[in-house]
Amino acid sequence: MQTLKVELGERSYPIHIGEGLLDQPELLTPHIVGRQVAIVSNTTVAPLYLERLTQTLAGYNVLPIVLPDGEAFKNWETLQTIFDGLLTARHDRRTTVIALGGGVIGDMAGFAAACYQRGVNFIQIPTTLLSQVDSSVGGKTGINHPLGKNMVGAFYQPSVVLIDTTSLNTLPERELSAGLAEVIKYGLICDEPFLTWLEEHVDALRGLDQAALTVAIERSCAAKALVVGADERESGVRATLNLGHTFGHAIETHMGYGVWLHGEAVAAGTVMALEMSSRLGWISTQDRDRGIRLFQRAGLPVVPPQDMTEDNFLEHMAIDKKVIDGRLRLVLLRQMGEAVITDDYPKEVLQATLVADYRALVDQLRG
């Protein structure tokens, strides 16, 4: 087992990474404040791991709250289901809410914990690669709004993140690839040697090699923990973690939540960010193509939806958390391994990026 730490003063917390951690109560019980525990999961994950976690928490008053699975249910109505369960079971301010699932469950359970009786204890047990390397670390919680993704939420840190890497053995191939999009992101924005490592090990990662997965998760979490410790509320450097997300969120919103997985949209969105960085002269076309090839090898889409127009993108991108005083800030690459957030770019470069023929670009790479 490896343990990392998110350094936030009195609110610092550990990230435990390893095999079989779901069966080790000593990793959880020090972070549970009372006798009441609510496990929030979904209809896919609960049949696989809920009973196991309940046994690990023997002696506690465990309330299971099982939600429908999917991004389409990351909304106010589903959030109310969590509140209904907590109130009906008379859970008090010393309850602990545990998120057992992927990013959707973690975001909603965390937001519920932040709101319930003005804040109760919260634990993250992420079961997908995407949630293990990204959404479970850093305290971002929330729900989607019909007009924009993750537009309603709060920063609310967990007391511990428990990453049992064996949970990936039941993860569908498409979900695994979606998680790799966020892993690749870390190499692009802050760790070029990690990007090289990923190029060498992407096949092993897709083959669920436990040693390779552990390395990828550790390096991703270490990168995110460092950034969150420096900028918890995304007022500066933390925004660079959103490489590809402005374009990607526009894709998710336009297509309908859940049609494209988050990681799939991030991959296509990151290709657009690479293209724009190249058009600005910040990275070479060879570096752009290097990123595209890695996303392809990870089994991810690298072409945005064909029916999305420039106006579609601009409409959705205007409703983005990085918009300040009406100016759209974008995360781009100054070079491989170095990201910046900026609103200082020619409008025509953004327009050219939005209308670029990505399918022709990919076909050229194949040739």
Swiss-Prot record:
Cofactor note: Binds 1 divalent metal cation per subunit. Can use either Co(2+) or Zn(2+).
Job of this protein: Catalyzes the conversion of 3-deoxy-D-arabino-heptulosonate 7-phosphate (DAHP) to dehydroquinate (DHQ).
Catalytic activity: 7-phospho-2-dehydro-3-deoxy-D-arabino-heptonate = 3-dehydroquinate + phosphate
CDD domains: DHQS
Taxonomic source organism: Pseudomonas savastanoi pv. phaseolicola (strain 1448A / Race 6) (Pseudomonas syringae pv. phaseolicola (strain 1448A / Race 6))
Source domain of life: Bacteria
Pathway this chain belongs to: Metabolic intermediate biosynthesis; chorismate biosynthesis; chorismate from D-erythrose 4-phosphate and phosphoenolpyruvate: step 2/7
Record-level GO BP terms: amino acid biosynthetic process; aromatic amino acid family biosynthetic process; chorismate biosynthetic process
HAMAP family listed in its UniProt record: DHQ_synthase
Gene3D superfamilies noted in UniProt: 3.40.50.1970, Dehydroquinate synthase-like - alpha domain
Annotated keywords: Amino-acid biosynthesis, Aromatic amino acid biosynthesis, Cobalt, Cytoplasm, Lyase, Metal-binding, NAD, Nucleotide-binding, Zinc
Protein's recorded name: 3-dehydroquinate synthase
Classification via InterPro entries: Dehydroquinate_synthase, DHQ_synth_AroB, DHQ_synth_fam, DHQS/DOIS_N, DHQS_C
Main subcellular location: cytoplasm
Residue ranges that the Swiss-Prot or TrEMBL entry lists as coiled coil: none
Residues that hold Zn(2+) according to the record: E182, H245, H262
